[in-house]
């Protein structure tokens, strides 16, 4: 679309607002970035089609066979630009202590000078795309606005899938609504300082990368990468790092969580939010197909949730995104048929393999690979090649509306009421299949101590733990201990209306090293018990680590689970748990006196209960 009309600010205005502020910001950045031209994005199908045709003509997208994947494309990144770069991700708070020990901190003014030098002229020879977007339904009470500047048409198109890009966003900005400014450049100008133009490449990027968040001013600057979360700034950068700071200041929660709508055979509806670190079954739970009759699970969101107390006092949540940016390998007919069905068309695939018939393939999509492929780097591939055909972090970008089990409420403006919150890691030892927290404080302690075992456990010990509190380790925009305190305050505010909190672990292993629980669709049996606990129809046994299902409370009909495996799934080894308490104490020590006293009290209480 053309740029919106420029209102004039009153003479002597101390600060511009509305569209005047937006235009002034775009003008200021354009002077720094020096693009050849500026295009304002409106999210329309016509503009998106023009951009994808342009990307195909430039060799940056490959159009897939429309018979197999209508309106779908494949992109191949530079081999150096395939994932988030956590070591080049910075939280530039005014006070280093506010970033905390889990974030990379840099002094803000020094970083600003560094960024201005990197961004100066970075868009010479390229087009600057202005992308106004809404996180959450446009105009909703839980939604937020942003504007991204980018020199990547691939990013502009991806933003149109992952967020709500529309001219209506500009109407809200014109009316005075605040917005988050985000700036992105691949850092590969096509014209040098002498005016000499060079040829473009299929995936421009720069060896030097910056992904920088300024919490106090709600700004995001990203340089050097065209990949996913580094470049689609609405995702992790805004929806979690900046939004978590906004949530702290404004009394809500921005979380790395899925939300599912669960309906019982009696027709009762529940909404569960769940936080899982990577490789812990998050997407599979978000799109769960229950193995037990009468229960249905529908997707509200698969990755990020924003939660805020509603007018009725209950915690309500929205999906701030409009699309899925999922990991392709391992997504197949057997593991997640729902996700595969969502990818029928209108999808951008990145770094997967190309079949000879013009469709895509990745490891895990089918049991047997095709006889010949073009791999993610553009080379011939056969099953004898001895290397993956798709990159392990290859992705699909698709509208959430295409998910065959998307809940009708996935984009309601005031969100859905949350009945329970689940936390889970990948634990071979100690953590039972499911346990309910005694209360909100105990639940926050569980969330703060989420971990996955990185090494095999020696006999009688716990393996090395990778801590990922609330699954927010790479994404919390401020001091993690302050984040825990914010969760505790939220519990005080919610009071008796607070959701119940549970811990789940699909990955407990037996002494012989095999998984004790079948997982996948059978996880619905655990979800059923959680739902029954929420409605008050299932019993529980009080233990040192939380409330466990009473005998025969879990529906195991037809599962064929040996009694000894069931016992092992809920076994509480006192010595191993005391050893884990020592590891938790060491972990809390990283945060010094900022750890909330309520959490150190929970740790002490856990030790007392184990020794009782």
UniProtKB/Swiss-Prot annotation:
Name of the protein in question: Phosphoenolpyruvate carboxykinase [GTP]
NCBIfam families on file: PRK04210.1
InterPro entries attached to this UniProt entry: PEP_carboxykin_GTP_CS, PEP_carboxykinase_C, PEP_carboxykinase_GTP, PEP_carboxykinase_GTP_C, PEP_carboxykinase_GTP_N, PEP_carboxykinase_N
Annotated metabolic or biological route of this protein: Carbohydrate biosynthesis; gluconeogenesis
Gene name linked to the record: pckG
Binding, GTP: 279-284, 395, 426, 520-523
Gene3D superfamilies: 3.90.228.20, Phosphoenolpyruvate Carboxykinase, domain 1 (3.40.449.10), Phosphoenolpyruvate Carboxykinase, domain 2 (2.170.8.10)
One Gene Ontology cellular component: cytosol
Superkingdom of the organism of origin: Bacteria
Organism ancestry: Bacteria, Bacillati, Actinomycetota, Actinomycetes, Micrococcales
Organism: Leifsonia xyli subsp. xyli (strain CTCB07)
Assembly with partners or alone: Monomer.
Annotated catalysed reactions: oxaloacetate + GTP = phosphoenolpyruvate + GDP + CO2
């Amino acid at each position: 679309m053309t740029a919106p009309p420029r209102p004039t600010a009153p003479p002597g205005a101390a600060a511009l607002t509305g569209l005047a502020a937006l235009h002034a910001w775009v003008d200021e950045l354009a002077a720094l970035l020096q693009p050849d031209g500026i295009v304002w994005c409106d999210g329309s199908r016509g503009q998106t089609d023009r951009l994808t045709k342009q990307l195909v003509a430039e060799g940056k997208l490959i159009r897939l066979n429309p018979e197999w994947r209508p309106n779908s494309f494949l992109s191949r990144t530079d081999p150096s630009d395939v994932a988030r770069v956590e070591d080049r991700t910075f939280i530039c708070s005014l006070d280093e202590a506010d970033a905390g020990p889990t974030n990379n901190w840099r002094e803000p003014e020094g970083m600003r000078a560094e960024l201005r030098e990197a961004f100066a002229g970075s868009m010479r020879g390229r087009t600057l795309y202005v992308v106004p977007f809404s996180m959450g339904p446009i105009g909703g009470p839980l939604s937020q606005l942003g504007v991204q500047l980018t020199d990547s048409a691939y990013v502009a198109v991806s933003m149109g899938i992952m967020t709500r890009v529309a001219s209506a966003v500009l109407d809200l900005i014109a009316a005075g609504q605040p917005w988050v400014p985000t700036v992105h450049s691949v850092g590969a100008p096509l014209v040098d300082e002498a005016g000499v133009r060079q040829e473009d490449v299929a995936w421009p990027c720069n060896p030097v990368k910056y992904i920088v968040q300024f919490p106090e001013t709600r700004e995001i600057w990203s340089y050097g990468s065209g990949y996913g979360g580094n470049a689609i700034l609405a995702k992790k950068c805004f929806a979690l790092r900046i939004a978590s700071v906004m949530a702290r200041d404004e009394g809500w929660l921005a979380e790395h969580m899925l939300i599912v709508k669960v309906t019982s055979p009696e027709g009762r509806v529940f909404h569960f939010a769940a936080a899982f670190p990577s490789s812990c079954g998050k997407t599979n739970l978000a799109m769960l197909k229950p193995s037990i009759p009468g229960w249905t699970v529908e997707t509200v969101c698969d990755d990020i949730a924003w939660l805020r107390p509603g007018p009725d006092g209950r915690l309500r949540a929205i999906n701030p995104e409009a699309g899925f940016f999922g990991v392709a390998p391992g997504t197949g007919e057997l593991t997640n048929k729902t996700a595969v069905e969502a990818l029928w068309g209108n999808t951008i695939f990145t770094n997967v393999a190309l079949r000879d018939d013009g469709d895509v393939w990745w490891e895990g999509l089918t049991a047997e690979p095709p006889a010949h492929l073009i791999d993610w780097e553009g080379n011939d591939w056969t099953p004898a090649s001895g290397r993956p055909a798709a990159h392990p972090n290859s992705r699909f970008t698709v509208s959430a509306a295409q998910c065959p089990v998307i809940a009708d409420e996935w984009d309601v403006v005031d969100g859905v009421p949350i009945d329970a919150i689940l936390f889970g890691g990948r634990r071979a030892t100690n953590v039972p299949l499911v346990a309910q927290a005694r209360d909100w404080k105990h639940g926050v302690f569980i969330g703060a101590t989420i971990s996955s075992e990185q090494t095999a456990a020696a006999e009688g010990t716990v393996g090395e733990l990778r801590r990922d509190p609330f699954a927010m380790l790479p994404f919390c925009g401020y001091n993690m201990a302050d984040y825990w305190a914010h969760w505790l305050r939220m519990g005080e505010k919610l009071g008796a209306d607070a959701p119940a909190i549970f811990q789940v672990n699909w990955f407990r292993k037996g002494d012989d090293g095999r998984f004790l629980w079948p997982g996948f669709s059978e996880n619905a049996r655990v979800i059923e018990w959680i739902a029954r606990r929420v409605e008050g129809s299932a019993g529980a046994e009080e233990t040192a680590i939380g409330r466990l299902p009473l005998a025969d409370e879990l529906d195991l009909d037809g599962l064929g689970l040996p009694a000894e495996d069931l016992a092992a799934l809920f076994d509480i080894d006192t010595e191993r748990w005391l050893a884990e308490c020592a590891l938790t104490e060491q972990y809390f020590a990283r945060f010094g006196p900022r750890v909330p006293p309520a959490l150190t009290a929970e740790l002490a209480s856990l030790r007392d209960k184990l020794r009782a």
